[in-house]
Amino acid sequence: MVSANQTASVTEFILLGLSAHPKLEKTFFVLILLMYLVILLGNGVLILMTVSNSHLHMPMYFFLGNLSFLDICYTTSSVPLILDSFLTPRKTISFSACAVQMFLSFAMGATECVLLSMMAFDRYVAICNPLRYPVVMSKAAYMPKAAGSWVAGSTASMVQTSLAMRLPFCGDNIINHFTCEILAVLKLACADISVNVISMGVTNVIFLGVPVLFISFSYVFIIATILRIPSAEGRKKAFSTCSAHLTVVVIFYGTILFMYGKPKSKDPLGADKQDLADKLISLFYGVVTPMLNPIIYSLRNKDVKAAVRDLIFQKCFA
């Protein structure tokens, strides 16, 4: 066990970000700022609608409101720091601030994994067992499911962050990333990180593998049920209720599985291209995905589209 005072030699980290490409920093500052504003606006509107519109007081939209709030929390934990790093010559972050950011970003990511599987279960019950839906997805059932997602994600993040921050950082303090991303921080440790790698692998199985299998099996049954619907209009209507969620799942898990699926204990020599790819994938996962979520649900869900129209009408003609 590494004692806490062994980490005292490093009191701050330097975030490399796009320091090697200074001409791109201002361009990325404007681009990410605009995307962040879209995230706040789009997800904020979805939260407002799920709370204020009585037609959306259903489990599906309660989970959607949680997802939107989660996306706002996740981006707010990292985007302001990224924006500041684009304008600041010396891009530093304290040891404690790095730990907080690592905890928040990991917690939000793990929570979203569980939350998306809960949303898949909601669609499975609604389409495959509609008569039991009011009982299985009652308020007394779906609210604990959502709360459990947050608790599970936060617990996993606490474990991973604690393990990472107890490592000794006695030499290099330059993080080759935009933020305190946990894999980038582990590369700086001057001790054996096999426990961290094993722990990360177990967490990947629990929060990536299990939800992916759960969602996959849910959609196998959902699609099989939809195909048995005799009318084309009925099949179209049934699929429209889950197409937005399926699109979000593919984008989210496709990105996060690629980024976290194989944690590396040390950075290989001459891996500059890999580091750049990791940064871009992390940026896509951290900014683009939360921006797309409300757009996807607004375009592919008729109830959300109707609620948006009602909200605009009320604001413009009230």
UniProtKB/Swiss-Prot annotation:
It comes from the Eukaryota. This is Olfactory receptor 13C7. One of its GO terms (cellular component) is plasma membrane. Residues 49-61, 122-181, 227-238, 290-318 are cytoplasmic. The chain crosses the membrane at residues 28-48, 62-82, 101-121, 182-202, 206-226, 239-259, 279-289. Keywords: Cell membrane, Membrane, Olfaction, Sensory transduction, Transducer, Transmembrane, Transmembrane helix. Belongs to the G-protein coupled receptor 1 family. It is found in: Cell membrane. It comes from Homo sapiens (Human). PROSITE patterns: G_PROTEIN_RECEP_F1_1, G_PROTEIN_RECEP_F1_2. Odorant receptor.
